[in-house]
Amino acid sequence: MMKHTLLILMLLICGMSASAQLTLKSDKGDFEARLIGRALFDGGVFFSDKTSLGNAVEVYDVRVGTVVRFLERWTGKIEMGFAKSKVSMKDIYIEYNDGKNLFRIGHCYEPFSLEYRIGTSDMKFNGAAVTGIAFGDRRRLGISYTYNCDVLNVSGGVFSDKDIDNTEKGDEGYAFSGRVLFRPYSKEKNVIHVGVSSRFGVQGEAEENKLTYSAGAPSNLISEKFLKAEVTDAINEWKFGAEVVMVLDRWYFQSEYLMAHVNRKASVENYTGDGWYAQVGYALLNGRYGYNKTSGMA
């Protein structure tokens, strides 16, 4: 057990990213292809009275992909990740967006929760909140629909409950996800939104009827999972989330509550876990935080 450990997050642990893009456009402007890529760095100096944590600097993830826009309202994206010497599939989807209606199919995030869905290119801190990592969303194969207007954003989707990297045989589970946002204040670039989301998933043989909730320290240098619960004999899972986001001038505030409940076979007790977080930021050097109304994320 690590006691009295101090992580100097603001000064001694630094998360950095470097990104690059190459864009090709047609003369008529009806086709555009962008090659995207970024590298994510992490470094830290740790002080501990008992547990020995090594000071280090590392490249913890590299992303490479392409985004293609065609026929005015269609977009396709393929992105791969190379973290810890392993190749993983990230966003692989095609979508149609007419401004108010968005249809998406492929390997992408379900419309549930907020923090863990924020892309690495848009992260505001060194890593995602522990609550978001443990109970938040994951990418799955499926289809979703989003309706968006000035004051309202409603999303829903149907997905496979199997991780795309899971090679186990057997019937896959399935999941239904939904998210509703209300923006009581929206003026120019300032916005306040409140929202709720829910997810219902049924585990299949391919998932071995097991669910794992885990999270570690807010640094990629520490691989240990300090919070971990393996829930076996799972029948189905309910998740619920509530969120608040405020982007006002240079200020940014985000808070979220997430809860997971697992119904298990009669021989064992059901599992319920929850958590919450709050984070605030202030943009320096004449900058400000942005907000995407379609995704409902700052």
Protein language model regions, located:
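Active-site-proximal flexible loops/turns
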Residues: M10, L114, N263
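A short hydrophobic/aromatic micro-motif that marks alpha-helical segments and, especially, helix-coil
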Residues: A18, V87, V262-R264
